[in-house]
Regions:
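Catalytic and substrate-binding clefts that recognize carbohydrates or anionic sugar/phosphate headgroups
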Residues: 2-17, 22, 45-50, 58-61, ...
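Generic recognition of flexible, low-complexity loop/linker segments
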Residues: 55-56, 66-67, 227-230, 237-239, ...
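Beta-strand-rich binding/interaction modules
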Residues: 65, 79-80, 90, 95, ...
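Aromatic- and carboxylate-enriched substrate-binding clefts and catalytic-loop regions
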Residues: 82-84, 144, 156, 173, ...
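Catalytic core of carbohydrate-active enzymes
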Residues: 490-495, 499-500, 507-518, 528-531, ...
Length: 747
């Protein structure tokens, strides 16, 4: 049986080998030369006999391709090889080089056994071994190993990252290939590259990954899809980037469907397989996680700063159906002194629920502009739900079809998403077509001109795959679609309102430029909360600064729409939300705090704490957008050398100064790991030494384990407010975590 063999298990060859497929493995380079500061390496590829025991197929001549090595500042080395007509380019929606990215000319010194590649300052950046391995021959039982590409990279001049030149059991039995490509029906279709991994190496990142902190041993399909929850291998936000405990990160510059194995298929290798006949890989090394993530942002863009009001409370549910209903809720929040900044209208503001036509229902919202302006006078911004598909019975369908604003379908498809209606989505808006993008922006502009301040760019993970898009094949557009979609909504929002913001669910590399993103349709349960936090931590280690989640989860169980959320889940998730970059209440049933009377006073207290902390959140956000830091920081972001931290995914740093440990059970107990340092309990003022566990803590429902660095000064707002319109950040004061600090509610 072919199972668990590299050819079939990772490279996805048909087990019965009935298709016209071939595998071409990289051999020892034949020559090397310098060109415009790059190093070009001519690499021959030998066709392989398709079998569990790989061997060269000498009936086919070798094919030779050029591998390019380019060096940048910030400890970044780039590898590029195209097996078709592709060439290296910086013109990509995913790339947005910062001024820190400067090309460093490379030079090569050739000796008999190796080619040394250095920058002009003499620092080693790559090394290629061209001498065959030394053998002590005594047996002819097995064939000699095939030629290979033995390449080592030194992106920062210090750390060595090797291609997996010899990851095999015996010469015919490969578990990974350093570099190879695949053909089908004579056409080059896929390419693979592998780096060595170490036995104790740990990994993180890859997007909003709902998994444990250390991703080693796992293999992921980098194909965006509706995650349908936060407790499975599906995800809304794949990012082709990972971080290693060896203090390097790798960004695979592609939007093709891909597979990434982090020492999963082979414990000796990190393997990448792209459904595209080219590889463009950036390897980034640094002394800290922040340096590596900043290097990634140097390549793909920095987050922009969300507006002040976005850091306040957002209130929503699925869904409000009328202006009267919304006004009643907003007035009650003000009357009962619940601070709040944003009211979100989900799927119910249209003529028909879920029928997105980008127009208000005239009966239930008779004066939308007046309605929005009235809310603004009360201190509320309005956010609106929509999605990037046009329904068969939407009023825009004829215009969209006639002008190719939606990609024409080549055959009918069934929806794979989580829409809760029977609508037939006739097509996906084609953001590869500039006229379609402008048409879509026009639909949003009409709403923004009324005073709407944020567009919820829901969905975008799935597109119609059997459709003709103007600028790209659907197989390449699928992952990139999130970026094009959110960019369009962000740009028109900023143009009209002056505030750059979206509320987005899907993501790919580069989407961090257009905040902000939330974690999708989590279950209102302890495992839903835990899964959300795991996803947020990995997302922050994938280049994103801002992230939120539905409080207290989106859907319920066992009844998806109608089960009741437990008080303690609502309370504990509120605490988690207060210590997140953004906090929005949303879900399939009522989310307003007065529906939970037993805990409503505690909820109000925590909402007020959120507004007290907004000066700190703004301060940390400004630092984040100019660095590599997220707001929600995994412990490994600060302590990558601490092995324990690679196995903790239920605690996090909130900014630089807070350590947060949400309670995610009904027993009101948990263990807390305090990293190295001196810590102060934010609620009790207790002083604690780090580098140890606090076991079986009893945590009252109105508190959460939150610790602040001893000696820190936390900017806080001294006055109670109804919304951020009442705030003047110049009036913020410093809360000194000194011997006089007795706890936030006691000072």
């Amino acid at each position: 049986m072919p199972h668990n063999y590299h050819l079939f298990d990772f490279l996805d060859f048909d087990p019965d080998l009935s298709r016209d497929e071939s595998l071409w493995k990289a051999y020892k380079p034949t020559s090397v030369y310098e060109k415009d500061g790059d190093i070009c390496i001519n690499v021959p590829f030998q066709k392989q006999v398709l079998s569990n025991d790989m061997a060269p197929d000498t009936t086919s001549p070798r094919e030779e391709y050029t591998l390019v090595i380019r060096q940048y500042t910030s400890g970044i080395t780039r590898l590029f090889i195209g097996f078709g007509e592709e060439s290296m380019t910086d013109q990509s929606e995913m790339l947005q080089f910062s001024d820190r990215v400067k090309k460093l000319p490379l030079q090569v010194t050739q000796t008999e056994g190796e080619w040394l590649i250095t920058t002009q300052d003499g620092i080693q950046r790559a090394l290629i071994h061209v001498k065959p391995p030394v053998l002590d021959r005594w047996s002819e039982l097995l064939p000699d190993p095939q030629e290979t590409l033995d390449l080592r990279l030194y992106p920062d001049g210090k750390r060595e990252i090797r291609l997996a030149a010899y990851d095999h059991f015996s010469p015919p039995r490969y578990d990974a290939l350093p570099l190879a490509f695949c053909k089908r029906n004579g056409v080059k279709e896929r390419a693979t590259l592998s780096f060595e991994s170490k036995p104790d190496e740990c990994f993180a990142g890859t997007g909003e990954r709902f998994a444990k902190m250390d991703l080693s041993g796992q293999t992921f399909f980098l194909k965006n899809q509706d995650g349908q929850g936060v407790n499975n291998r599906r995800t809304y936000k794949n990012i082709p980037f990972y971080l290693s405990s060896r203090m390097y990160g790798t960004f695979y510059h592609t939007c093709a469907h891909s597979k990434l194995s982090l020492a999963g298929q082979s414990t000796r290798s990190v393997q990448f397989l792209s459904d595209q006949a080219m590889l463009d890989v950036f390897v980034i090394a640094g002394d800290t996680m922040e340096e590596i993530l900043r290097g990634y942002r140097d390549l793909t863009g920095y987050p922009s700063m969300p507006p002040l009001w976005s850091f306040g409370i957002w209130m929503s549910r699925m869904t409000y159906f009328s202006a009267d209903e919304v006004n009643e809720i907003c007035d009650r929040m003000r009357a009962e002194h619940y601070p709040c900044d944003v009211i979100h209208l989900d799927t119910g503001w249209f003529k028909t629920d879920w029928l997105c036509e980008w127009k208000f229902n005239e009966e239930r919202f008779p004066d939308p502009k007046g309605f929005i302006q009235g809310l603004k006078k009360k201190g509320y911004r309005v956010s609106l739900w929509q999605l990037p598909y046009v329904a068969e019975n939407a009023e825009q369908i004829d215009e969209a079809r006639k002008n190719d604003y939606i990609a024409p379908l080549t055959k009918k498809q069934d929806s794979e998403g989580s829409n809760f209606s029977a609508l037939d989505y006739a097509g996906t808006i084609d953001f590869t077509y500039p006229k379609a993008t402008e048409w879509y922006k026009g639909l949003l502009k009409n709403l923004l001109d009324m005073g709407v301040t944020c567009i919820k760019t829901d969905f975008g993970e799935n597109i119609h795959m059997d459709a003709l898009y103007k600028g790209m094949k659907p197989e390449l557009l699928n992952n990139l679609y999130a970026l094009l979609y959110q960019k369009a909504a962000y740009e028109i929002t900023k143009d009209v309102t002056g505030d750059g913001i979206v509320w987005a669910r899907s993501a790919w590399a580069g989407c961090q430029r257009y905040p902000l993103h939330w974690g999708g349709d989590s279950c209102s349960s302890w495992d839903g909360m835990a899964g959300s936090l795991k996803g947020g931590l990995h997302f922050g280690l994938s280049g994103f600064a801002f992230w939120s989640h539905d409080v207290p989860g989106f859907h319920t169980l066992p009844n998806f729409m109608n089960s009741i959320v437990d008080d303690d889940v609502y309370m504990r998730w509120t605490q988690f939300g207060v210590f997140s970059s953004h906090i929005r209440y949303h879900g399939t049933n009522k989310r307003e705090p007065w529906h939970y009377p037993a805990i409503a006073p505690m909820i109000k207290k925590w909402w007020k704490l959120r507004y007290t902390l907004i000066p700190y959140i703004v301060e940390q956000s400004r630092k984040a957008i100019a660095s590599g830091a997220p707001l929600l920081q995994a412990l490994i972001f600060h302590h990558p050398e601490d092995k324990l931290c690679w196995h903790i995914d239920d605690e996090y740093y909130f900014g630089n100064d807070f350590l947060v440990a949400p309670v995610m059970n009904s027993e009101n107990r948990r263990d807390v790991y305090l990293p190295e340092g001196k810590w102060v309990n934010f609620f009790t003022g207790e002083r604690l030494e780090g580098g140890r566990w606090l076991k079986n803590l009893d945590v009252p429902l109105d508190e959460m384990p939150v610790y602040v660095r001893q000696g820190a000064t936390i900017p806080v707002y001294p006055d109670e407010v109804e919304c951020t319109d009442d705030m003047d950040l110049s009036k913020s004061i410093g809360l000194h975590i000194d011997p006089h600090f007795k706890g936030i509610f006691k000072n």
